[in-house]
A protein has these predicted regions:
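Hydrophobic ligand-binding cavity/cleft-lining segments
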Residues: 1-49
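Short helix-coil boundary/hinge micro-motifs
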Residues: 5, 14, 59-63, 72-76, ...
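Intrinsic-disorder/low-complexity, polar/charged segments enriched in Ser/Thr/Lys/Arg/Asp/Glu/Gln
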Residues: 6-14, 52, 92, 104-106, ...
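N-terminal pre-ligand scaffold of iron-sulfur
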Residues: 20-24, 33-40, 133-221, 234-235, ...
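Hydrophobic-ligand binding "helix-grip"
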Residues: 34, 39-42, 58-102, 271
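Short, hydrophobic/aromatic-rich segments at coil-to-beta transitions
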Residues: 49-55, 74-81, 177-183
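Beta-strand/loop substructures that line and gate deep hydrophobic ligand-binding cavities in soluble
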Residues: 82-131, 262-264
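Short cysteine clusters
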Residues: 207, 226-229
């Protein structure tokens, strides 16, 4: 490995998110293989704290892994992502966050590479520019949606204890399958109606973890999976299905009414039971 690092490229852009959202995203190691599934296949955390985090990260499309440390500089809006082991070992990506307004932050990313000559630095730098443009596009979309959830622009689930309204008609039961997935907006919140081998189910379109878009989540084995962090929830109960203490409110039921209509019934107690 060379004694010194070489600057491969510099990536600069504006992000439509606050400095607070940027730092939240930087510390959010869990999202890497989910939001960035085209780049990363998995992550195993070793340690994390206010300083940053250290983890083993699988690369998509193969068996290669990186041991990565992300570390903040004290009292500065700067962090380093260093490759401790694996492809690019010794390299240091330095990111500077520059707030421009309440909801706009500029970033400057410097790729300092452990390569023997300038030609290789330039070659790898070009690839990193393409990769990071995609990664920041994906992160920006996540941060914008996260801010909308916090601001209440997107409807959030009704609070526990809210009185149950009358059943909501969804249309003819015989035609429901053909209309799925079906988005339903109610005073109790926004839901998606889906079908599995066990029947019809409705679930909130917002993940209780960080407001992720469950309305875009995959339905697997009776669970809905959050596309941001991979949290899994049981469709029938709203309970977390992956051992993490994170649960949805008890979901409404989809049932056949006496008149042949599909009806959405809301429970009086909206908290999922153990």
């Amino acid at each position: 490995m060379p004694d010194e690092l070489r600057l491969g490229a510099v990536y600069e852009r504006s992000i439509a998110a606050s400095l607070e959202r940027l730092w939240e995203n930087v510390h959010d190691w869990e999202h890497l293989p989910w939001v960035h599934e085209g780049a990363f296949s998995g992550i195993e955390l070793e340690e994390s704290g206010d300083w940053g985090w250290r983890a083993r990260v699988g690369l998509a499309g193969g068996d290669e892994t990186l041991r990565v440390e992300l570390r903040r500089e004290p009292d500065r809006e700067v962090y380093h992502t260093r490759t401790l082991e694996g492809p690019g070992e010794g390299s240091d990506t330095i990111v500077r966050l520059i707030p421009r307004s309440e909801r706009v932050t500029d970033i400057r990313v410097e790729f300092w590479l452990a390569v023997p000559d300038e030609q290789q630095a330039e070659m790898f730098g070009k690839g990193l520019l393409t990769l990071y443009a995609r990664l920041w596009d994906e992160d920006e979309a996540m941060m914008v949606m996260r801010q909308e959830v916090i601001d209440g622009v997107r409807s959030s689930p009704a609070r526990a204890g809210t009185a149950a309204p009358a059943p909501l008609a969804l249309g003819p039961w015989s035609e429901l399958s053909a209309r799925l997935p079906l988005a339903v907006s109610t005073a109790q919140g926004e839901f998606r109606v889906v079908e599995t081998d066990s029947g019809f189910f409705a679930h909130s379109v917002f993940c209780p973890h960080r407001g992720g878009p469950l309305g875009e989540g995959e339905i697997e084995a009776g669970h809905v999976v959050c596309p941001w962090h991979g949290y899994r929830f049981v469709l029938a109960s709203g309970r977390g299905a992956d051992g993490r203490r994170c649960h949805m409110a008890k979901p409404p039921r989809v049932e056949l009414g006496a008149d042949g209509q599909a009806l959405l019934f809301f429970a009086d107690d909206r908290i999922a039971e153990a």
